[in-house]
């Protein structure tokens, strides 16, 4: 399968791509809720931040796909790239913490306690410091943790976003 076939498909159906990404993100969020409320897994602060990134991706992709204006596709793809890139970064950081857990728990407070107790400019950096909870692997599928699989999905969304951007920009240049 050549790159032109893929980009041609992207060019002919970008709204379908945005709809697919939005539905996939919603599906991942639903699965996260299932793991939390049915299986009983408690999300760590990094998991919650990844959920926020997925919500952003779902909203951006959904609104862009629902719009009939092709001019919005480039902006939507750029915003989707930023949101999914951020989510991939957080998932990669959590995966790294799982592979190389810190010797000492570096963040003892829970997410909501930090947000309620500290001003936002202090709470947000505390969230990204990670904790023993973030390094704990509670569930795996085919040898990958939730953070590993979330990174894979965010990576695929990043690639789709880049392909959409490249195709749109290359059409404007030529």
UniProtKB/Swiss-Prot annotation:
Organism: Albidiferax ferrireducens (strain ATCC BAA-621 / DSM 15236 / T118) (Rhodoferax ferrireducens)
UniProt cross-references to Pfam families, sorted A to Z: DsbB
Name of this protein: Disulfide bond formation protein B
One GO CC annotation: plasma membrane
Disulfide bonds, paired cysteine numbers: 44-47, 107-134
Molecular function terms from GO: electron transfer activity; protein-disulfide reductase activity
Keyword field contains DNA-binding: no
Keyword Cytoplasm appears in the UniProt entry: no
Gene Ontology BP term (one): protein folding
InterPro entries: DiS_bond_form_DsbB/BdbC, Disulphide_bond_form_DsbB, DsbB, DsbB-like_sf
Keyword annotations from UniProtKB, A to Z: Cell inner membrane, Cell membrane, Chaperone, Disulfide bond, Electron transport, Membrane, Oxidoreductase, Redox-active center, Transmembrane, Transmembrane helix, Transport
Major site of localization recorded for this protein: membrane
Cytoplasmic compartment segments: 1-17, 68-74, 168-174
């Amino acid at each position: 399968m050549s790159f032109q076939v893929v980009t041609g498909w992207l060019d002919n159906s970008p709204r379908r791509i945005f709809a697919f990404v939005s539905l996939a993100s919603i599906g991942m969020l639903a699965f996260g809720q299932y793991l939390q409320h049915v299986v009983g897994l408690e999300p760590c602060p990094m998991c919650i931040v990844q959920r926020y990134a997925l919500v952003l991706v779902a909203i951006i992709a959904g609104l862009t796909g629902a719009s009939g204006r092709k001019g919005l596709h480039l902006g939507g793809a750029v915003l989707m790239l930023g949101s999914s890139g951020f989510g991939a970064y957080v998932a990669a950081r959590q995966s790294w913490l799982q592979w190389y857990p810190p010797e000492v728990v570096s963040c003892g407070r829970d997410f909501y306690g930090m947000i309620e107790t500290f001003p936002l400019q202090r709470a947000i950096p505390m969230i990204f410091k990670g904790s023993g909870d973030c390094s704990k692997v509670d569930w795996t599928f085919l040898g990958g943790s939730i953070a590993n699989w979330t990174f894979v999905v965010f990576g695929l969304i990043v690639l789709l976003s880049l392909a959409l951007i490249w195709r749109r920009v290359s059409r404007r240049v030529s």
